[in-house]
Amino acid sequence: TINGNTVPVHPSGGFAYVVPLSIGKNTFKIKSGTEELNYVIMKPPAPPAGTYKAPELKEFENLKYALVTNDKSPLRSTPVDSGINRIAHLQKNMPLVIDGEKGNFYRVILGSQKTGWIWKGNVKLEESGESLAELKGYDYIDSDEFFIFVFHLDKMTPFELVESSPFLIKFYNVKNYPDNTYVMDFPVEKSMQKGKLLGYSGQFSGTDFILKIRKPVITDEKQPLKNIRIAVDAGHGGSERGTTGCLGDREKDVMLEYAKLLEHELKKRGADVIMTRKGDDYKDLNERVELANSENALFFISLHGNALPDGKDPNANSGTGIYYYYNQAKPLADDIIKEMTSQLGMKNDKVRQQSFAVVRNTNALSILIEIGYMINPSDNAKMINKDFQKKTAKAIADGIENFLKN
């Protein structure tokens, strides 16, 4: 009981119980058989409501020039430092033309018809600069795995890679093109198997921009995963423990078990598996992605156990959810969640687009799987069950195979 109220306990021994807190002192008496624990939790009063004034747009009388100071600086469609509003990730020393500011963001000119936003902390203003770049042409380089285009410019300039049909590469602030924007299309429907993008990348090397689009993958009908490179990412690790389940299991430990089982299942089917971590060690999020990219992985599968913010009822949330950022990865997520929910009997907690660091990677089809809610007693009991873990690995592998077949 908690304060005399009977708490439902799952057969596994786990439970989740929500008690609203009052302002000030909250006393909890927890009894289980002859054992009793007492806790005191203080809830401070809410701070007085202030008058928030949204920042206003200030347009400059004269254009300003800036250089990007940090690699992978997000160029955004709105002046908000979060969410799915990223246009591109800009490299250090890329020149920008600025025509205004709003709060902590500068407004960036993108051709004559479009603007973007960049956080002020990612740029430094320059005394002078040039507004337009010159595109001198491009070369096509054929390779076994990629369509490669090398665009020759006289300086770096903002760009955008658009996942559409056709796939578009746009260079902004380029002279001698309509709206100061160069656009080249790549016929995905004609060039790719069933019109599916399978990974791409674009970045400057000096003043040359190198665009790589992965070619269609030829699979073995009897063994679709044979020689397919797959990065398996066990979430968290080391000092980053992740969430804690109802029975004290740590997400970092449970996900490593899942990752090893998935590695075994994929290798059994002929896949080449890259593990972002093999033990209880801390790995930076970018380090995980860079490892997958250095090994030229086709898929990046990150495994996690879900949780909820304080105040949310764990009993009301359950099931398997999958997150992606770039649209090219959504069909993969759809195929995997279909297998996981049907084979494991888990509730479908939906496929969603979200700006998580490990899925903001275009080189591989990148997804993050929340296998279940570790703070939900029912989900947690399943997730620590060894037989369930093996079935999960099989369901994920089946989903990847279905994606390659369809």
Spans of features found by a protein language model:
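Active-site-adjacent mobile loop/cap segments within catalytic or ligand-binding domains
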Residues: 295, 299-302, 307-309, 321-324, ...
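Active-site histidine-acidic residue metal-binding/catalytic motifs
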Residues: 214-291, 295-299, 309-312, 316-318
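Second-shell loop/turn segments in exported
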Residues: 80-83, 240-253, 276-282, 319-327, ...
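Short linear recognition/processing motifs and adjacent strand/loop elements at protein termini
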Residues: 5-230, 264, 268, 305
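Solvent-exposed loop/turn segments at secondary-structure junctions
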Residues: 124, 236-240, 279-283, 305-310, ...
